[in-house]
Amino acid sequence: MSKVGTKDLYTPSGIAYIDDYVFSKEYPWELLGGIKAYIQSLIEKGMPGFDKIQPDVLIGQNTTIAKTATIIGPTIIGNNVEVRPGAYIRGAVIVGDESVVGNSSELKNAILMRHCQCPHYNYVGDSILGNFAHTGAGSILSNLKSDNKPVVIHNEGENIETGIRKIGSFLADHADIGCGSVLNPGTIIGQNTQVYPLTMCRGVYPSDSIVKGTKEIVKKR
């Protein structure tokens, strides 16, 4: 059974305001309900070195925001971030330093740690992306079951009842999601694991693996 604790999936980003929150809970899904309030508290206190481009949107230094991008607060975007044309940030979002949010990518109630890339046509809702995580073009982190029931995380025979209706995915550090893949609600991708294009993922995938298909997982050499 794979370990799914916050400290099992993520390492410190070196960005204090992100690390303080991410490592405040034992499990990553426990973070989702407090993201909005945490961002609001940071904005109210003020963050040195950040510019306020809207009453509830802060951006860091050397960050570029395309004119056609849409950003709804509360949102904090770090340093050296690129938000490209057509990006849609729906609020309750933290985008860590050196990250990319690309054309037609939509983020909602999510944290991207350091150097994350969601560059083309991605949906990232109610999710946490670790350092250097990458979502290939058209990959979707689905956050709502078709029956609207609370999300259950399936971990090698153990079913973890979260009691939460909306959960996307938790991508650990250096997780790489192939183009056109769909991650079902509650999917966890371990550190340094690669998902092949057009794969449907459900459950927990171990670190240092290659996911070639829904039921084909091999250890990296």
Place the predicted regions along the sequence by residue:
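ABC ATPase A-loop
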Residues: 58, 76, 94, 170, ...
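Glycine-rich active-site/cofactor-binding loop and its immediate structural neighborhood
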Residues: 61, 65-104
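Glycine-rich hexapeptide-repeat left-handed beta-helix
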Residues: 18-19, 103, 112-114, 119-221
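Surface-exposed loop/turn and secondary-structure junction residues enriched for glycine/proline
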Residues: 12-13, 25, 56, 62, ...
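Terminal amphipathic alpha-helical/low-complexity segments used for targeting or macromolecular assembly
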Residues: 1-56, 61, 192, 198, ...
